[in-house]
Amino acid sequence: MAREYKIEDYRNFGIMAHIDAGKTTMTERILFYTGKNHKIGETHDGASTMDWMEQEQERGITITSAATTTFWQGRDGKKRRFNIIDTPGHVDFTIEVERSLRVLDGAIALLDANAGVEPQTETVWRQAEKYHVPRMVFVNKMDKIGADFYRSVEMVGSRLGAVALPVQLPIGAENDFVGVVDLIEMKALTWDGTIGAPATVGEIPADMADKAEEYREKLIELAVEIDEAAMEAYLEGTMPTNDELRALIRKGTIEVKFHPILCGTAFKNRGVQPLLDAVVEFLPAPTDVPAIKGIDVKTETETTRESSDEAPLSMLAFKIMNDPFVGSLTFARIYSGKLTKGVSLENTVKGKRERIGRMLQMHSNSREDIDEAFAGDIVALAGLKETTTGDTLCDPLKPVILERMEFPDPVIEIAIEPKTKADQEKMGIALNRLAAEDPSFRVKSDEESGQTIIAGMGELHLDILVDRMKREFKVEANVGAPQVAYRESITRAAEIDYTHKKQSGGSGQFARVKIIFEPHDGDDFIFESKIVGGSVPKEYIPGVQKGIESVMGAGPLAGFPMLGVKATLIDGTYHDVDSSVLAFEIASRAAFREGAQKAGAQLLEPIMKVEVVTPEDYVGDVIGDLNSRRGQISGTEARGIATVVNAMVPLANMFGYVNSLRSMSQGRAQYTMQFDHYEPVPTAVAQEIQKKFA
């Protein structure tokens, strides 16, 4: 079977937004207008197509990014293939967003016309900047009370630091919003609100003619800056044609020089079709973005993989999901080459082979079996054994490791216990499955209490995982109170000279090490050997490193993992008969325990970046409350009629904050929080923690 659509006619994009900007409704409309959905699912009644896990439907927020393939006929009459990746908008799921942005070529940022740029919009926008993803902006909910298109455009500049390029203006607002002015064609597009109805094209309303002229002029001025020849022609008085203008906007968008801005209301079916045309006209095909970089496994040098069917096969696994009918599904983006069912591929990250059994094309929650797929495709693979998120699968003869994704460490932990003996076994399976799907979720067991501890990015994150355990795996569990993931570190250098000697019939054990332990700025552990003259033979040195690493998981104060330690082995002594790797391991273990005490061990706690958006009446209460939680206020700013309070607050003092904020502001204030850094715990608090955990 040959390729059906040319790679130039692909658009791999996602929709990114704040929690309530209407992303699910927008995705639904896109699926409806592109002909894949016959009945529109409304988020309000929990029947939406993309949000296919039960909790997403109940909570009305999108958690799992599902990939959907659909098609759209552009203005030029040519059909394009859209692969849409749904991304979550809640801060506890930023890992999902990061992961989907990694495999997109472009994105639509959705704004709520009333709220404009919200905290989570900024977070997601920053993540998209990191991967240099071309973006358009759609100002949604233009029918809402307080909708203000021009303020939203201004906020794209002031809050996101991005260059906004309106290509449409709204006709009317709130209840009177009827359509848009197309600034390229200089026509008015209006809709009567009937579902699926095309726009009526007419003349621009007389009272908007001047404004439209002014904005078109700004549009042209920004667009011609992208191209020298166009700029020269413009300065000499030659205006670009509409097609030339579209080509310039496309070039600038793909180069992330500016962001086209459109508007409408997905819920009332106004403005959706022009947005789909804009996806075709302004967002990149896989061949328009730089080729993906990777490391050639054989030569260990940097290499690239072009978006072409002729190039060696390479693909990136970006999501693992458990499908009730198919079992484990691995979603992967094919960057280069052609994939055929039944082939064996190399997982270069794990160094294992994987056989491709069943291959599926997903449409939100229905699926179609396929036998082959090509560069640019996003496919779901059933039954992979070794592959986890972020792994590369490729042609075994041309092995490559594509860029790795980096995932943050979890900041919150809870103890979890199965309710019955029967739940015990099921819980282990469920937790392993969930951890394979989500790299920001960790499972470990507490050696002393024997309890199972789960760790994640926030309270909502863990709530949802416990909920999934109950629903998908039928595991009933008791959940403890959330615990902070404290860490320990050292404050000064200490030199330790330690000898391990054991003599008990036959050969004994002997090792002497002299190690300097000192703090360093990073969070990782650094080991260095400065042994000269063979006082510790080369083959024993890894034992020294291993010994230290084995005890760094439990610091001397309260048994928390240690961060930011550098150990330098400077001297030692060995015995021809009694020394071994194990003896040096034991010696360095004891040396570290002694060193951590002498080097001024201290407790560290996670500090969260908190942003509260509140009506002005409650600002005093919000600030007072954050101060009482050991928070440091870093500033306040006006946002429309609301005030934004920014603060750094220890995570330990933020549990249950959502309820306090709700009652303090009569439900009118909102907040977002994300991990920022670790900081030493004040002495009085540290003593309490040590008492509790020692």
Curated annotation (Swiss-Prot):
Family annotation (Pfam families): EFG_C (PF00679), EFG_III (PF14492), EFG_IV (PF03764), GTP_EFTU (PF00009), GTP_EFTU_D2 (PF03144)
Superkingdom of the organism of origin: Bacteria
InterPro entries per record: EFG_II, EFG_III, EFG_III/V, EFG_IV, EFG_V, EFG_V-like, EFTu-like_2, G_TR_CS
Annotated PROSITE patterns: G_TR_1, G_TR_2
UniProt xrefs under Gene3D superfamilies: 3.30.230.10, 3.30.70.240, Elongation Factor G (Translational Gtpase), domain 3, P-loop containing nucleotide triphosphate hydrolases, Translation factors
SMART domains, A to Z: EFG_C, EFG_IV
Residue sites binding GTP per the record: 17-24, 86-90, 140-143
Keyword Transmembrane applies: no
Main location: cytoplasm
Keyword Nucleotide-binding listed: yes
Alphabetically ordered keywords of this record: Cytoplasm, Elongation factor, GTP-binding, Nucleotide-binding, Protein biosynthesis
Alphabetized SUPFAM superfamilies for the sequence: EF-G C-terminal domain-like, P-loop containing nucleoside triphosphate hydrolases, Ribosomal protein S5 domain 2-like, Translation proteins
GO cellular component terms given for this protein: cytoplasm
One BP term from GO: ribosome disassembly
Gene Ontology MF terms in the entry: GTP binding; GTPase activity; guanosine tetraphosphate binding; translation elongation factor activity
Its biological purpose: Catalyzes the GTP-dependent ribosomal translocation step during translation elongation. During this step, the ribosome changes from the pre-translocational (PRE) to the post-translocational (POST) state as the newly formed A-site-bound peptidyl-tRNA and P-site-bound deacylated tRNA move to the P and E sites, respectively. Catalyzes the coordinated movement of the two tRNA molecules, the mRNA and conformational changes in the ribosome.
Family note: Belongs to the TRAFAC class translation factor GTPase superfamily. Classic translation factor GTPase family. EF-G/EF-2 subfamily.
NCBIfam families reported for this sequence: EF-G, PRK12740.1-5, small_GTP
Protein name: Elongation factor G
